[in-house]
Amino acid sequence: MHIIKPVWLTHGGERKDFEVYSCDVSPDGSRLVTAAGDGYVRIWSTEAICNTNDPAVASKPKQLASMSNHSGTIHTVRFSPNGKYLASGADDKIVCIYTLDTNPPSHATTFGSNEAPPVENWRTVRRLIGHDNDVQDLGWSYDSSILVSVGLDSKVVVWSGHTFEKLKTISIHQSHVKGITFDPANKYFATASDDRTVRIFRFTSPAPNSTAHDQMNNFVLEQTISAPFANSPLTAYFRRCSWSPDGMHIAAANAVNGPVSSVAIINRGSWDGDINLIGHEAPVEVCAFSPRLYASQPVDKQAMDNQHGAQNLVTVIACAGGDKSLSIWITSNPRPIVVAQELAAKSLSDLAWSPDGKCLYATALDGTILAVRFEDGDLGYATAMEENEKSLTKFGTNRKGAGITETPDGLLLEEKSKAGEIKGVEGRMGALMGDDQADNITNEKPALLPSNAPTPARPSSPAPDAQKSQPNGTATPSAPEPEKPDPYQAKLERLKQRPTYTKDGKKRIAPLLVSGAGAAESSLPQARLMASVSNQVKADTPQSIVDLSKPFDGLPKGGLATLLFGNKRKLAQLEEDDDGHVEKRVALASQNGATPLLTNTPDGLLPARPQPAPTGQQPTPEFIRPAVTNPCMAMSQVRLAVPKVRNQILRAIDPNGKPTEPPSASGESSKSRVDVVFEARNPSAASLTGRAVDREPVRLTLFRGEQPLWQDFLPRTVLLVTGNQSMWAAACEDGSVYIWTPAGRRLVSALVLEAQPVILECNGPWILCISAVGMCYVWNVKHLSSPHPPVSLQPALDAAIHTLGAHPSAAPAITNARINSEGRIVVAMSNGEGYSYSPSMFTWQRISEPWWAVGSQYWNTTEAPVGNLQTADAQKDKDAKAAVSAGIIPFLERNTTSETLLRGRAYFLQRLIKVLLSREGYESFESSVSIAHLENRLAAALSLGAKEEFRLYLSMYAKRIGAEGLKMKVEELLKGLIGGLFEEDEAGTAQRLQENEQEDRNWRESSETLCGWPREVLLKEVILALGKHRDLQRVTVPYAKLLGVVDGESDVGDAMET
């Protein structure tokens, strides 16, 4: 080891040398740059420094250039890793960007100075203004895509490494920020501050033409580390930290271990600092890892390849600070291998390694600039950079810089992509401020709204006194002529704020909250799982539309209970009841109002004797008795809770045919909203003859107001009723289902099921019935058909993990079971999972689950709850096809959020994922899960035919895989979108489609539409979203040419508004 300190290597002044605050080495190792208090940035030849005694080098120039573009002391200077730029920051609050001009310098030495004439022509290309105080440190990402500056104004400013536009200002530190370092895997950067914290920020490298809007949700805080710096002194001039070349550790300066100054080694992933380097007598102000990995023996590349990296490689770190000493550590040794003291008269301010790891440069506040040259074996034996890349591959590293557009078409596509994004931003801002109201009124083209965007809801008006009566028992309300609304009045209504009053009587203004899919514009959104705590004030925003039947006969709190039985269960053996448990249980049930049907006697089961009638006035019971269990349930592997027999069952619809609360349940105020009420009244008295078969019939009546429209009788007890403007249905205790036309004519003979019905829903002509053994039936009363055979709920109840059990086990409860306008069954469970049955594949599909809620960055838990959704009236929508399956995916995901938070699973799942992220092999876990979540959403929207959701999720997916640079997925997506658009249909539609398969619900179809959208429109949107990524232009430009995107002007606004 040699310490070299040339006399000429200084920022000289008239009386003394100026303080040198920073130094750095160029990526090719040929230049050393220094910054000092004289306001100069000086570039030196490293060859001249390290070979001072060599006569052959003495004649070569030592100082290559000097720049004086700052008006004060320069605190930091850094080369970009691609070697193209040089950045400096000073106390004039400015960051200057220099670049090397190939032309020789045009000016000689400044008049009146002793400066040597410049050898290289470094010119200033940009002056970056963004700080309010001194700039203390700078850092470049390893792909040179961003530059980050920190300063005494507590700000962290992110600049584009291509255009040097300010991308984001992060004001999260509470005091001066004095250090920054970047992760070599290009995933994080860390900042150190006088608020005694080191903060880790996660980022995705922005594209060359990215704007501040693009990066709104990029550069997010990952972790705050404060324990190692709890009592660290605030007198240090710098807190320059460093990231190890293998990406595993951060060396943080100015840490403390008890009363002793130390360097904290922070582990990646867990972000804990349990290792400390102790030995310096004053605060350590700068740490620097060598850029190479070292081996204990001379490195043979072929031997390393044969060992597949089995040889243990170590890292080397240099530390310096206020005690004017330099220490060098190796990770395999608990003590420093080199300690050099009194290297300068004042504190050492900065350290910089040469790219080959053989030379270390140091600067000090007394003006000292020195070099420490190591011989082979002093630190170990440096390995090739390929070993660094191998160690970083487990983090999913992406260190390549931005490519260069290869053709003018690629540049034109990039410009159109950016122009479309700007237009989309302007459109969203106009909608936010209410400026688009007039345009929406006069424009004939329907606005393209995402599924969770606020949709205007039609106001409900009271039914008129005189309505035209139809033979089907429903009324057709008179439709007034639509008046042209005042656009200015509509704008005022949109911006109106509702006043509310607190408990103490103070007036408060509840602002309108705008929620939409615009937050997913960035390629790296934030995921938050939080509970809603404010639902006292009803939202002023219109409710979202969901294409599902509205449950009129609500399920019990917590959902419909279910039981699963395994294949190995044993039937219970009948034994003598010595203690009389059965009699006690029967007596207790009789006290609660239950009526016995059978009596267990020595002669066997006999009909129970009628009970004496109670005397006096008795209240009307809410239910009469439990339903009789069907014998087939004894052998079924699935059992659902059966509703009790109620005295009165009501179903009410409003004049628009939508379900509503019956008058008896909602009071007098709701009578004006009720048009027709369907009532089933079960007999509450015992049989007059004493025989169960002689009980009174059930009376079914359809009312309009107080007037009955028709009446019918059934000999069997009714459990559930449903209906709408198209039909009425009742499900009985013996498993039979009866269906009437609106006029009261029986449409079909009784439909007999294998067990009692527990859920009965309808939507248009479709009826959904679920029996007590978990069988789901769907009927179309218009065509008297079914889209598929009866299907069991057993797969959706996690039955696969209970099939071999010997005892019954509780399964997830059913919290929602509905049907959409196409007859698709949608089921939500109490464990947070949501399912839909696919008639074309004859299987259940899991649409939503808690895994996405805690693992995906695209999960949104801050939107409106499930209760704010209203059912869609597809018959009255102008575009009925656009309303198919609308809102089903957000509905199921919101149910997942509420159930996950309610049962506390979110906490444990988040802890699990946090542990996984710190383990080796799971570094790309969050990104992979987020992309998989988008793919699941996309597949669900396509299967359900949810038109608006499909377009929204397709745009989000294209932007994410483009930002991640997943070329194979991009190419596959474009091939799937183009389908057979430009191919001749030789096989014909009949051969393409299978039975029960929709024409535009398949990627591989040659139809011109996909999920209701023209394939050409979707393909153009995806190409424009991917066009700004230069590394993908070899894939996207041919498709852009095929569609004519780059041939002429085209409307790209709609493509980016989603």
Swiss-Prot record:
Q: Where is the composition biased (Polar residues)?
A: 467-477, 590-602
| Family annotation (Pfam families) | Beta-prop_CAF1B_HIR1, Hira, HIRA_B
InterPro entries hit by this protein: CAF1B_HIR1_beta-prop, HIR1-like, HIRA-like_C, HIRA_B_motif, WD40/YVTN_repeat-like_dom_sf, WD40_repeat_dom_sf, WD40_rpt
Q: Which SUPFAM superfamilies match?
A: WD40 repeat-like
Top-level lineage group: Eukaryota
Outline the WD repeats, range by range: 15-54, 69-108, 130-169, 172-211, 233-276, 279-339, 343-384
Could you provide one GO biological process annotation from this protein's UniProt record?
regulation of DNA-templated transcription
What does the UniProt entry say about where the protein is found?
Answer: Nucleus
Record's keyword annotation contains Repeat: yes
Residue segments, region Disordered: 427-488, 590-618, 652-672
Look up the signal peptide feature and give its range.
Answer: none
Tell me one GO molecular function of this protein.
nucleosome binding
Q: Name one GO cellular component term.
A: chromatin
Coarse class of the primary localization is nucleus
Membrane in keyword set: no
Which of UniProt's keywords are assigned here?
A: Chromatin regulator, Nucleus, Repeat, Repressor, Transcription, Transcription regulation, WD repeat
What functional role does this protein have? Required for replication-independent chromatin assembly and for the periodic repression of histone gene transcription during the cell cycle.
Cite the PANTHER family for this sequence: MEMBER OF THE HIR1 FAMILY OF WD-REPEAT PROTEINS, PROTEIN HIRA
What the record says about family reads: Belongs to the WD repeat HIR1 family.
Listed name of the protein: Protein HIR1
* Gene source species: Aspergillus oryzae (strain ATCC 42149 / RIB 40) (Yellow koji mold)
Q: Which gene encodes it?
A: HIR1
